[in-house]
UniProtKB/Swiss-Prot annotation:
May be involved in the stable assembly of several 4Fe-4S cluster-containing complexes of mitochondria. InterPro entries: APO_dom (IPR023342). Coiled coil: none annotated. GO terms for cellular component: mitochondrion. It is found in: Mitochondrion. Residues 1-13 form a transit peptide. Residues 127-213, 294-380 form the APO domain. It comes from the Eukaryota. Residues 48-58 have a biased composition (Basic and acidic residues). Residues 37-59 are annotated as: Disordered. One of its GO terms (molecular function) is RNA binding. This is APO protein 3, mitochondrial. The keyword Cell inner membrane does not apply.
Length: 402
């Protein structure tokens, strides 16, 4: 993307200069300077700081497309007031081709958490006591970006403490749905009785993973839609569900026993990074069929056909909504929130990141940074974000750099 911009700027300057006639042949070169809508997949800049909390999150799907879908659904209800829902998972059935994907995501999530819990003993993690800043390295950095209480009196300097695995990877929680088809919403009075679990785990359960602790109803026949209301005429059968829970739990336990081997830090870091990529890829596939909702103003998330009705939003304009969330379509960053940290190029050096050189430092997701410091190779898609091609100037050379 940068090369394209440089070529465009250079040709524009040449054409506008007084020497354009003498070098007309240069501008007529067969150079493809067309700007594609799709950005270079290998180029990813350092993520920008979060926007103002008063602004709503952008819609992944354009509003015109959402209105068109709503009109089609309304017209279909008028034409067929009573109909059988045919497309899973809206009809209460599982998507057959995504059952294995759900098991893979669940397995990769367990391997990711297990690997990070072992790597954290070798790669220190630091967390600011007053804000959400996370740093991976022997010592906390000196970059003044703290926004917590009293940050003005400390010149925005962070106050570091020892971090945990939950600071490295963020799995937001949502309400667990026993029956996503007939009862897709949790009301306000049920907020203390319905358990909340990780959104990734809830997505796997709704896609076919059976867990004894969090049961879910499985159907063999689709449900009916009568004037927009979901009705189920199938008899409840608990026998098959119990067998599925027992077999799935047994397979997971056997898989964990087989993989309990002593591995080096480099091998463990590489496998943990692979588990992260496989989990994110699987979650993307599941989100194409299973709906996930997020609030447009706060981090609340819900997996299911609709968002819940619990009135606990405290973000912008929540008084106008009576505490209800402004639900919209979620993205992968809402389900698996990457915590971006500053990249430490040489962890064994012992030097601390300086605030005056922060524009030369790169960033990366905390999981990637932790695995890279553990010995795993840097993924190609994070080379530019980590700014590996940038040479750090010395502290006394900062004023000499343009």
């Amino acid at each position: 993307m940068q090369r394209r911009k440089l070529v465009e700027i250079s040709i524009f300057v040449i054409r506008k200069s007084n020497f354009s006639s003498s070098i007309k042949s240069l501008t007529n070169l067969d150079v493809d300077v067309s700007v594609d809508n799709d950005e270079d997949p290998l180029y990813a800049d350092v993520p920008k700081p979060p926007k103002d909390k008063s602004e709503r999150k952008p819609y992944p799907t354009p509003m015109k497309e959402l209105i068109r879908r709503a009109k089609e659904e309304k017209q279909l209800r008028k034409l067929q007031p009573c109909r059988v829902l045919e497309d899973p998972p809206d009809n209460g059935l599982l998507v057959p081709e995504l059952v294995d994907v759900a098991h893979c995501v669940h397995r990769c999530r367990n391997m990711l958490l297990s690997g990070l819990s072992k790597i954290i003993h070798h790669v220190p993690v630091h967390r600011c006591r007053l804000c959400a800043e996370v740093h991976i390295g022997k010592q906390g950095h000196e970059i003044r970006t703290c926004t917590g209480p009293g940050s003005g009196s400390r010149s925005a300097t962070h106050v570091w403490k020892r971090g945990r695995v939950s600071d490295v990877v963020l799995f937001p929680k949502c309400f667990h749905l026993y029956d996503r088809a007939v009862k897709p919403r949790v009301i306000h009075d049920e907020r203390f009785t319905v358990p909340k679990i990780s959104a990734v785990l809830e997505l796997c359960i709704q896609a076919g993973v059976d867990l004894e602790k969090f049961p879910s109803k499985r159907r063999s026949k689709p449900v009916y839609s009568i004037e927009g209301r979901i009705v189920d005429f199938e008899d409840v059968n608990d026998g098959n569900s119990e067998l599925a829970v027992t077999s799935t739990t047994t397979l997971i336990q056997e898989d964990d026993r087989c993989k309990e081997e002593k591995k080096s830090l480099k091998e463990l870091s590489f496998e943990t990074m692979e588990s992260w990529f496989e989990m994110v890829l699987g979650v993307r596939k599941l989100m194409e069929r299973y709906r996930v909702w997020t609030c447009g103003y706060c981090p609340e998330i819900q997996v299911g056909p609709k968002g819940h009705k619990v009135r606990m939003c405290k973000a912008t304009k929540h008084q106008m909504r009576d505490g209800m969330h402004a639900w919209q379509e979620a993205t992968i960053d809402d389900v698996v929130g990457p915590t971006y940290v500053w990249h430490v190029r040489d962890p064994t050096d012992g030097s601390v990141l300086d605030n005056s050189l922060k524009r030369f430092y790169g960033k990366a997701p905390a999981v990637i940074e932790m695995c890279v410091q553990g010995g795993a190779p840097v993924p190609d898609q994070y080379n530019s974000m980590m700014r590996l091609d940038v040479v750090y100037p010395q502290r006394d050379e900062v004023d000499l750099v343009a």
